[in-house]
């Protein structure tokens, strides 16, 4: 059975287009679903986290292990998933702070990627990501969209190169067209 990790980054629980899109995508794909709602506190990295992360695992104190416990859980969720479905609202041309905090918690050298003589290598190969993008005025893929390229790069960096974007962009300009485009892209996922 397919295991899906659904990640919702919108600060809005009600009326969120990206959450609506992730719901539709997950319903279409079916399978076992783990939901990670990033409106619950995902802490930003701090000095204690950095120190714990760069201490070899077998040398970490109990406090350092506790410091990394949420990060370990988040990484395990990604490792267990076959498909990630990520809700990506574009806030001020970029990703929400909560999504950036999640990325910081899961992008760990020696855990989800490693450095080699030829450069970094992602360790999460063989997974798929579907990123549901919603924006009020920013056109996905445009020169002022710093979110979709960032997500494609980060996912590729950790080894997830099969990335599909479902976009409902420019919702404040033409909501009907935005929803229609997203629906067409969602239907294509079933093909």
Curated annotation (Swiss-Prot):
What sections of the sequence does the record tag as coiled-coil? Answer: none
The Enzyme Commission number assigned here is 1.6.5.-, 1.7.1.17
Enumerate the InterPro entries for this protein.
Answer: Flavodoxin_fold, Flavoprotein-like_sf, FMN-dep_NADH:Q_OxRdtase_AzoR1, NADH:quinone_OxRdtase_FMN_depd
Q: Which reaction does it catalyse?
A: 2 a quinone + NADH + H(+) = 2 a 1,4-benzosemiquinone + NAD(+); N,N-dimethyl-1,4-phenylenediamine + anthranilate + 2 NAD(+) = 2-(4-dimethylaminophenyl)diazenylbenzoate + 2 NADH + 2 H(+)
Has keyword NADP?
no
Cofactor binding remark: Binds 1 FMN per subunit.
Q: Where does FMN bind?
A: 10, 16-18
User: Domain of life, per the record?
Assistant: Bacteria
Requisite cofactors: FMN
Spell out the family assignment given in the record's similarity comment: Belongs to the azoreductase type 1 family.
Query: What's the protein name?
Result: FMN-dependent NADH:quinone oxidoreductase 1
Q: Which organism is it from?
A: Jannaschia sp. (strain CCS1)
